[in-house]
Design a protein with these regions (language model features):
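C-terminal accessory "lid"/substrate-recognition subdomains
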Residues: 1-127, 138-141, 147-157
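Active-site lining segments that contact anionic ligands and/or coordinate catalytic metals
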Residues: 129-131
Length: 157
């Protein structure tokens, strides 16, 4: 078994496992299976400069969005969206986890997280840009354009 692990580790450029490691090469092997090209999809009007990067990992689909610091989100719309997700928004899949750092005021930023049915909101010192991550449950259908639309509707106008 160790010989098989060592030969697999050579494929992904890993060195020998640390003493006592229970999964010595799992991360390296998984990294080797990841796509090398990242597709960046523009989101919203060109002036908004939003972007989405789709993610497929361990049977889960999802994406990461980035919007520039000039874009602000409506805290009420974001919370309504996340509160409705357990089954109230058809056609977008069932999210397993949502995490975002969003500007919701002139100098007010929040960390928003949803795992299971729980939604939390907390102030954060992050000020670089708006970031959103969505991970669907395994096997859920992925409709990225529908998610793009949801985030655009949550922006303040």
């Amino acid at each position: 078994v160790l010989a098989a692990l060592v030969s697999e580790s050579a494929l992904v450029g890993e060195t020998a496992p640390a003493a006592g490691s229970t999964r010595p090469f799992a991360h390296g092997i998984e990294r080797a299976r990841l796509p090398t090209a990242v597709v960046v999809t523009p989101v919203g009007p060109p002036a908004m400069r939003g972007e989405r990067r789709d993610v497929q990992h361990l049977g889960r689909a999802g994406a990461r969005w980035r919007f520039p610091v000039e874009v602000a989100f409506s805290e009420a719309r974001v919370m309504a969206l996340l509160g409705a997700l357990p089954g109230g928004l058809p056609g977008i899949g069932r999210p397993e986890r949502v995490k975002a750092v969003l500007r919701v005021g002139e100098d007010e930023w929040v960390l928003v997280q949803r795992a299971g049915e729980a939604v939390t909101l907390a102030p954060t010192a992050w000020r670089r840009d708006n970031r959103i991550e969505v991970q669907l449950a395994p096997g859920e259908p992925w409709h990225p354009e529908a998610w793009d639309d949801l985030w655009l509707r949550a922006c303040r106008r």
